[in-house]
Amino acid sequence: MTTICTLLKDSQLPDSPSARLDTELLLAAAMGKPRSFLRTWPERIVPREANERFDDWIARRRNGEPVAYILGHQGFWSLDLEVAPHTLIPRPDTELLVETALATLAADTATVLDLGTGTGAIALALASERPLWTVTAVDRVEEAVALAERNRQRLLLENVEVRRSHWFSALDGRRFRMIVGNPPYIPASDPHLSEGDVRFEPKSALVAGSDGLDDIRQIVAQAPRHLLDEGWLLLEHGYDQGAAVRELLGARGFAGVHTLRDLGGNERITLGQWAC
């Protein structure tokens, strides 16, 4: 029989920068308890079934599999989302895109499009904050569409429509007050693709050509046909792509183009306004 304290001590993940947190999350979930339980009752015996479940999960984590995929869920904004290996894991940096969208569009009612929705994180976060907005969330991957719809239903967000579309392909000329997106933006040759958690994430949601801008170019080129007059386009991109994305938006005719930095000081979100 093993106590919580002993199991945490003996099951560290030396190769993970968040080793203690990862271990606690896995053990708490294996026991069906909140993390606070582990610290409140460190001498409690871990039940055999929970111990076996934890041993399996910790082995998967040592192999590099992300905690979110092991547990099947991830927190984003104020939401708890189901995740799966055919979608990206929502990241804290992307919350800046949600913050920017909410700050940019002050209207109580609006139509918003989320491109490449994945788990539905961005669309569902916006819809939860603005219940009178009508949000359309699209993804080209059928499994991602099904996952986003499950998250929508579980969160009871009736102001979101989830549908399958490769960017704008299935939108039939519909126009929106705002378009947001976190498209693939990693260059195909980036060595980080073979390192850490990202090894387990779908490359189709990460890689966009030799310079990482192929999908952003396509979105910028097509977005004006789907924006209302004075509508906004907001895009997340790589830390070193701000200047390139600003140039693309400016060349396409967007006004007020500017870039916001994330908490790490990196250029992360670029936006511009369309005027017919």
Swiss-Prot record:
Keyword Aminoacyl-tRNA synthetase: no
InterPro entries: DNA_methylase_N6_adenine_CS, HemK-like, N5-glutamine_MTase, PrmC_N, RF_methyltr_PrmC, SAM-dependent_MTases_sf, Small_mtfrase_dom
Organism: Pseudomonas aeruginosa (strain ATCC 15692 / DSM 22644 / CIP 104116 / JCM 14847 / LMG 12228 / 1C / PRS 101 / PAO1)
GO molecular function, one term: protein-(glutamine-N5) methyltransferase activity
Entry binding sites for substrate: N182, P183, P184, Y185
Enzyme class: transferase
Enzyme Commission number(s): 2.1.1.297
Protein name: Release factor glutamine methyltransferase
